[in-house]
Structures are given as structure tokens and as C-alpha cells.
Amino acid sequence: MSLSAFYVTGTDTGIGKTFVSCILLHMLRGRGQRAVGMKPVASGCTYSDTGWRNEDALALQAASDPTPAYDLINPYALPAAVAPEIAAIEAGVTVALEPLSAAFTQLRAQADVVVVEGVGGWATPLNATIDQATLVRALEIPVVLVVGLRLGCLNHARLSTTAIMADGLRCIGWIANTIDPHMARIEENLALLRQRLPIPYWGHLPHIPPGINPATLAARLHPQGD
């Protein structure tokens, strides 16, 4: 896999972007690459002796090698567990591209690959003037889509893919992540997604119970070019 960075987005919030990003980091590390994660903007942070910290960003930090400073992984750590734009307003913080680009540049200098995890679904804004598409353009990186397998995934996946491409960005692959273990016709839905999405398929993750080490699932993902 020759990419130096990519952006992980999803069909919705709560569909496993962080877990998939951690699996990708372990996959890359298993191939001898220095791989680090980044969560540019995170809401729902908790305060500790070291400052505001986000659970997802900490998971990315733990899956990274080398281990970057937390402030590079998560430049904007917002307390309220709401949409980032609302959380930033409540915290009196203005999210700007410059600190995000600067942190990303430092991470790229430390690693062979940077896995950047987005917020919510693709259309979730960062503030009144910055969408995730704005950030991805500024970083000049492609997008990987995580599709949460549950009722409605066909619609959500097709809309998300269309939106990414309409924004003029390159979507280089998609990963199916089983959110609802009781979803009817999972294989049939997966087959339809593979037929209808005009982007490469990187693999399918089964429903994973809490506590599973993401490193154990690295072999299930196969980025294009492998």
C-alpha cells in the first residue's frame, strides 16, 4: 500500500470508524510501515491531569507506532458530546484549518502513513464555513468510506459515496462493518453494495464484541493494490 495518508469517513456516526482506523493502523504496522492516527476534531472529551482527552483519539494513539504527542493526534478536543460545530461554540473555540494542517504535517514527518479519522458522517460540518471536504482538500488526501451494515445501509452508502465524489474528492475504497448482528440478509446487502458502489471494496468486518484487540482483525482488510 503506497499511500502516505488517507481520511476515514463513515455513513453515519457510531458505525465503527475508530475501530476500523485502528485495524488499518495495525495492518500497516504489520507490513513494516510506521503508521500513526489522527483525529483532527473530537467532541465528548473528558478532563484529566493531562488536559481534555477523547476516547477515540486515545485509541488511535495506542494503535500508532511511533506514538505521537496527543495534541498532534487531536488538535481540537471539545468537551460536549454533541456535533463538533455545536461543541466548539459551547467551548468558545474556533476550529481553523491552519492548526489542523500543521499537526498533520508534523505527523507525516514522523510516519510513513497517517490515518486521519473524521467526525460523524461525511456531511457533518466542523464549523459554519469548514466541512470535512474542506479539510480533506486542504490535506490533499483521498477518502476511505466505512459502511455500517444495518437496515438502511444501501441508501446511506450510496448517498455518502455520491457526496464524496460530488465534492471532487477521490474515494479509494470502502469497508463494510457489521453494526447490527441481527440484521436480516447481511450477505445479500453486502452483495448489492459491492455491485452498486463505484469504488474498490476493501473487506468486511463481522460484528465484533467489546474488548477485541483490533490487531487480530488486520488480515480481514485488503486495500486496493494488495
Swiss-Prot record:
Pathway: Cofactor biosynthesis; biotin biosynthesis; biotin from 7,8-diaminononanoate: step 1/2. One of its GO terms (molecular function) is ATP binding. It is an enzyme of class 6 (ligase). It holds the Pfam family AAA_26. Substrate binds at S43. It catalyses: (7R,8S)-7,8-diammoniononanoate + CO2 + ATP = (4R,5S)-dethiobiotin + ADP + phosphate + 3 H(+). GO terms for biological process: biotin biosynthetic process. Keywords: ATP-binding, Biotin biosynthesis, Cytoplasm, Ligase, Magnesium, Metal-binding, Nucleotide-binding. The keyword Nucleotide-binding applies. Catalyzes a mechanistically unusual reaction, the ATP-dependent insertion of CO2 between the N7 and N8 nitrogen atoms of 7,8-diaminopelargonic acid (DAPA, also called 7,8-diammoniononanoate) to form a ureido ring. Belongs to the dethiobiotin synthetase family. This is ATP-dependent dethiobiotin synthetase BioD. The gene is bioD.
